[in-house]
From Swiss-Prot:
The lineage of its organism: Eukaryota, Metazoa, Spiralia, Lophotrochozoa, Mollusca. The modification Phenylalanine amide is found at F9. It is found in: Secreted. This is Peptide tyrosine phenylalanine. The keyword Secreted applies. The keyword Secreted applies. GO terms for biological process: neuropeptide signaling pathway. Keywords: Amidation, Neuropeptide, Secreted.
């Protein structure tokens, strides 16, 4: 996964 502030990815 990528380092992001998303609830779903």
């Amino acid at each position: 996964y990528a380092i992001v502030a998303r609830p779903r990815f």
